[in-house]
Amino acid sequence: MALHVVLFQPEIPANTGNIARTCAATNTALHLIRPLGFSTDDKMLRRAGLDYWEFVNIHYYDSLDHFFQQNQNGDFYYITKFGKRYYTSYDFSDPSKEIFFIFGRETTGLPKELLAENEDRCLRIPMTENVRALNLSNTAAILVYEALRQQSFHGLS
C-alpha cells in the first residue's frame, strides 16, 4: 500500500463516504482520526460509499498522536489552503513510498500548530479568491489521482 488518505476528525458523512469510494477504486488506504462527526452506521456515509466498503482498507485512531505512533515511516503531506506551494510541485512518483495526504475538518481544517511545524509539507490546490474552500471529497480525489498520475497509474487498469 503506497497511498493513504487521512481524515482528521471529519464532520460530514457524505464526504467520508465519497472518499471511501475513491479509496476503494484506487487501492488507497483510508485513515480516520476520532472523534468523527457522525456514526459509522450513518445512512449518508453508507450511501455515498455504495457497496464498495468491503474494498476499503480503513483504519481508526483516537488522536493525531495515535495516528503518528502507528505510521512512523511515511511521507506526510498536509492539505491546506494556507500552503505556500501547489500540490503539483511535489514529487509523488515513487510507488514504493508510503505517501499520506492529511486533511483537516471541513469547518476548521488542520490544527494550526501542526501546519506551522510542517510548513514545508503544506500544499494547496489553486482556486479563485471568491471561494473559501473546495469540497473535501473533491480535494482528496484530486490529490490521490495526481499521485497516481505521477506513478503512471501503477496498479490500476
From Swiss-Prot:
Keywords: Cytoplasm, Methyltransferase, S-adenosyl-L-methionine, Transferase, tRNA processing. InterPro entries: Alpha/beta_knot_MTases, SpoU_MeTrfase, TrmL, tRNA_m1G_MTases_N. GO terms for molecular function: RNA binding; tRNA (5-carboxymethylaminomethyluridine(34)-2'-O)-methyltransferase activity; tRNA (cytidine(34)-2'-O)-methyltransferase activity. It catalyses: cytidine(34) in tRNA + S-adenosyl-L-methionine = 2'-O-methylcytidine(34) in tRNA + S-adenosyl-L-homocysteine + H(+); 5-carboxymethylaminomethyluridine(34) in tRNA(Leu) + S-adenosyl-L-methionine = 5-carboxymethylaminomethyl-2'-O-methyluridine(34) in tRNA(Leu) + S-adenosyl-L-homocysteine + H(+). The keyword Transmembrane helix does not apply. S-adenosyl-L-methionine binds at I79, G104, I125. Could methylate the ribose at the nucleotide 34 wobble position in tRNA. This is Putative tRNA (cytidine(34)-2'-O)-methyltransferase. It comes from Geobacillus stearothermophilus (Bacillus stearothermophilus).
